[in-house]
């Protein structure tokens, strides 16, 4: 590996102690879809892809998004990652990364009003510009179920050997739709004030932590600025 000048970032390649575990350095490979998720031998291919990144020096890898609920599965998509055989398949990925000296988190992604199927839900029935389907406004019971889905899904990730999960709360997907006033026009406990709009992601994180325990990484990904009218402001994000 060629020598890299890290003078501006002297701690970049130092270990990071998380209390219950440590990362070999502070290099994180952010979540991205690789195109390998839905092809034959996908788990073996993802294992090889991510293991090579770990061997190359990445301390913590975050996978592309996996969906925790039927309400966000596109038409024709594979079944949810909740069956024992799927847990076993994902262990192929985590084992390969661990053998290469890295750690890996799985991103949990609910696409909300971006989901390309007719039974999609959102905080408010506002159609996404990129989708022909109009979402149904989620009921209180549906909101509670989606929170539970995130928590349940995190257990399957833990069983598959992942070191943690990343909860996708940015870029216009379901969690971000609750946080932003532009897409959340509710007047109940899940909408209106910022404290109400942020309730959904906070409850998700709390429930996930309750299910997985303290010795499991939880990353929460949020948009720093939505850069659209009615999106989250800098002041809200700082809160």
Language-model segments: residues:
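Flavin-dependent oxidoreductase catalytic cores
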Residues: 1-239
């Amino acid at each position: 590996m060629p020598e890299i000048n890290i003078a501006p970032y002297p701690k970049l390649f130092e270990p990071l102690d998380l209390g219950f575990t440590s990362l070999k350095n502070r290099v994180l490979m952010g979540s991205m879809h690789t195109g390998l998720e839905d092809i034959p031998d996908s788990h073996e291919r993802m294992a090889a892809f991510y293991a090579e990144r770990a061997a190359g020096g990445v301390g913590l890898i975050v996978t592309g998004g996996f969906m925790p609920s039927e309400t966000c599965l596109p038409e024709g998509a594979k079944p949810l990652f909740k069956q024992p055989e799927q847990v076993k398949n994902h262990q192929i990925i985590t084992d390969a990364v661990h053998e290469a000296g890295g750690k890996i988190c799985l991103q949990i992604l609910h696409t909300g009003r971006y989901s390309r199927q007719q039974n999609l839900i959102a905080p408010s029935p506002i159609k996404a510009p990129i989708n022909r389907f109009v979402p149904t406004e989620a009921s209180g019971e549906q909101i509670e179920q989606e929170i539970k889905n995130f928590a349940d899904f995190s257990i399957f990730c833990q069983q598959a050997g992942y070191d943690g999960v990343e909860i996708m709360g940015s870029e216009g997907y379901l969690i971000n739709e609750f946080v932003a006033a532009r897409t959340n026009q509710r007047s109940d406990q899940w909408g209106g004030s910022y404290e109400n709009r942020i309730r959904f992601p906070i409850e998700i994180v709390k429930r996930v932590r309750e299910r997985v325990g303290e010795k499991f990484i939880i990353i929460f990904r949020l948009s720093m600025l939505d850069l659209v009218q009615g999106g989250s402001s800098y002041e809200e994000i700082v809160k």
